[in-house]
UniProtKB/Swiss-Prot annotation:
Keywords: Bacterial microcompartment, Carbon dioxide fixation, Carboxysome, Photosynthesis. The tight homohexamer forms a pore with an opening of about 5.0 Angstroms in diameter which is positively charged. Sulfate ions are bound in one crystal form in both the pore and between hexamers which may represent metabolite flux. The C-terminal flexible tail, which is the most variable part of CcmK proteins, seems to be involved in packing of hexamers in layers. One of the shell proteins of the carboxysome, a polyhedral inclusion where RuBisCO (ribulose bisphosphate carboxylase, rbcL-rbcS) is sequestered. Assembles into hexamers which make sheets that form the facets of the polyhedral carboxysome. The hexamer central pore probably regulates metabolite flux. Probably the major shell protein of the carboxysome, a polyhedral inclusion where RuBisCO (ribulose bisphosphate carboxylase, rbcL-rbcS) is sequestered. The central pore probably regulates metabolite flux. Hexamers make sheets that form the facets of the carboxysome. This is Carboxysome shell protein CcmK1. It comes from Synechocystis sp. (strain ATCC 27184 / PCC 6803 / Kazusa). Homohexamer. Interacts with full-length CcmM. Forms mixed heterohexamers of all possible stoichiometries with CcmK2, which might form dodecamers. Only very weak interactions with CcmK3 and CcmK4 were seen. Interacts with CcmN and CcmO in the carboxysome. It is found in: Carboxysome. One of its GO terms (cellular component) is carboxysome. It comes from the Bacteria. HAMAP family: CcmK (MF_00854). GO terms for biological process: carbon fixation; photosynthesis. Its main location: other. Residues 4-90 form the BMC domain. The lineage of its organism: Bacteria, Bacillati, Cyanobacteriota, Cyanophyceae, Synechococcales.
Length: 111
């Protein structure tokens, strides 16, 4: 299984909450965090199997449109991020989200 990273950058916090909620409901992914960029920009980050992350990002983008004033600024999926990224960028599975990772995919072996 290839673990991917999916990101959606939105304008406004309500839009990112809607994106995050719809992303984890639509596919077997784990929400690993969000980043406040500034000027109302917020990015939500999920991880999981490549196909699940693709479905998740698609659902997030579609549902942001339901939020009054919600706007998708950008989105991207990295299919197999280099492990060095985990140590520098906020895409790691932290202790706080590990329980949800196991629920999403109980066969995952912890590193």
């Amino acid at each position: 299984m290839s673990i991917a990273v999916g990101m959606i950058e939105t304008l406004g916090f309500p839009a990112v909450v809607e994106a995050a909620d719809s992303m984890v409901k639509a596919a077997r992914v784990t929400l690993v965090g969000y980043e406040k960029i500034g000027s109302g920009r917020v990015t939500v980050i999920v991880r999981g199997d490549v196909s699940e992350v693709q479905a998740s990002v698609t659902a997030g983008i579609e549902n942001i449109r339901r939020v009054n004033g919600g706007e998708v600024l950008s989105n991207h999926i990295i299919a197999r991020p280099h492990e060095n990224l985990e140590y520098v960028l906020p895409i790691r599975y932290t202790e706080a989200v590990e329980q949800f990772r196991e629920i999403v995919n109980p066969s995952i072996i912890r590193r």
